[in-house]
Regions:
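Signature for the C-terminal beta-barrel architecture of outer-membrane proteins
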Residues: 1-303, 307-318, 328-364, 368-369, ...
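Residue-level signal for short amphipathic helical patches enriched in basic/charged
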Residues: 325
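C-terminal structured domain segments
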Residues: 364-395
């Protein structure tokens, strides 16, 4: 009926221990249990998080550079207080969850901007019945990036307290994930949008080896009205991301399964770099075909082909993967991803500087990979070699930049 959590500690700041303690508490109250109603769920929850930073309120009135780099302008207290309130409802396949979060005092959410209060509104609606399910999520956030220590210049993911995932589909195919949404709040302080997800499974319960799975997803995000300190002007919110995609999975028999995916993506490339007053929209259409052939109970072969067509950014791409599995322990694969179209001068994309002539040149590179994995109980070892493209790698709604390199990757996963 009642659940209380209390936590306090000193977080890690990249490779060192931070000097700023963080503490918090969470309270959950199940109203449905208290009323003896067990056919559904009604609950309310509340949380508090505090952060202490010594001398956070000190300003630098005569050193504009220090104000910009250390971001202390407008901070009035060494203690940052944040609260949230949540409500949950579930009944006969319908679920509704809402949350409101508030920063009670001014805080630095971007070192280049003044301190300000922040808030988040998040609403989740879901429905499922037999083989159909639908979900919709809406979120508006403003000034909610919260640093462990806002004074260091390193303001990446390792210096972040709160986890605010991106509400877009997390694609598993390489070309669909070539230009993921990285969030507009990094440069503008806020964003508003959401996504809708639909799923339906068509199957005969008496024939398990044959079925259809249909999945569709749509997401859209806009910036919010804000004052751009970088541009020195008020800026209206605008659309920065649209992704519409659907995929169809077909199990033909016990041996053959196919998947087809289509995705349309449009994004504002300018907002990925700075708070620009104008948009530069890039568009891409992605097509994926995936075939798995099960040879016997232990051996299977999978082939995957992808094509991305675009008149913007880096032009067209093609990709292919061949994978052979020896269940339950071994898997081997070889893949290639090729930027197969040159773009006209002035376009975003595949330009590289010749360090001898200092001129921009086209390079249509192959990003090849060969690798394998071994799995035993809870241990998984994966080894690969190849050329890796520079770009953003997203996992669980969190994106990090990965530089281009050619080399060996070794990954070890052990769960216990």
């Amino acid at each position: 009926m009642v659940n209380v959590k209390v936590l306090a500690g000193v977080p890690r700041l990249y490779d060192i221990r931070s000097n700023n303690p963080i503490w918090g508490a969470d309270l959950s109250l199940s109203i449905s249990d208290m009323a003896g109603w067990y056919d559904g769920l009604v609950s309310v929850e509340a949380s508090y998080v505090g952060r202490y930073q010594k001398n956070a309120h000190i300003e630098y009135p005569h050193l504009d550079l220090e104000e910009l780099l250390f971001g202390s302008q407008g901070v009035e207290s060494d203690v940052l207080n944040m609260i949230s309130a949540r409500a949950n409802f579930e009944y006969k396949g319908v679920s509704l969850r809402g949350e409101y979060v508030q920063k009670l005092n001014d805080d630095i959410y971007n070192p280049a901007l003044d301190a300000a209060k922040g808030n988040v509104i998040n609403i989740d609606l879901g429905y499922n019945y037999k083989r159909f399910s639908a979900s919709a999520t809406f979120r508006r956030q403003e000034n909610m990036t919260t640093f462990i220590d806002f004074r260091p210049l390193g303001i990446g993911g390792g210096n972040t307290i709160n986890y605010i995932p991106l509400l877009t589909r997390q694609h598993t195919y390489s070309l669909a994930n070539l230009n993921p949404y990285r969030g507009a709040s990094v440069h503008t302080g806020g964003e508003v949008g959401g996504q809708i997800d639909l799923y339906y499974s068509l199957r005969n319960p008496k024939v398990r080896s044959k079925y259809w799975n249909f999945h569709a997803n749509f997401s859209m995000f806009n910036t919010i009205d804000h004052n751009s300190k970088l541009m020195g002007m008020d800026m209206e919110g605008r659309n920065v991301w649209i992704d519409f995609n659907f995929d169809v999975e077909r199990q033909w028999n016990k041996s053959v399964k196919t998947t087809f995916l289509y995705s349309f993506q449009r994004w504002d490339e300018e907002i990925n770099h700075f708070d620009s007053p104008t948009a530069h929209y890039c568009r891409s259409h992605i097509f994926v075909g995936d075939v798995t052939y099960k040879i016997n109970k232990k051996h299977s072969l999978r082939f995957e082909a992808q094509y991305l067509t675009s008149e913007d950014y880096e032009g067209d791409w093609v990709a292919a993967t061949v994978e052979y599995n020896f269940a339950p322990k071994f898997s081997f694969y070889v893949s290639d991803m090729w930027n197969c179209e040159k773009m006209q001068d002035g376009a975003y994309g595949n330009y590289y500087m010749n360090l001898n002539t200092f001129e921009m040149e086209h390079k249509l590179l192959h990003y090849y990979q060969v690798g394998g994995s071994f799995t035993h109980n809870s241990l998984r070892v994966q080894l690969s070699y190849g050329r890796n493209r520079a770009g953003y790698v997203c996992s669980g709604g969190v994106c990090r930049f990965q530089p281009a390199y050619t080399g060996v990757n070794l990954a070890l996963t052990l769960s216990f």
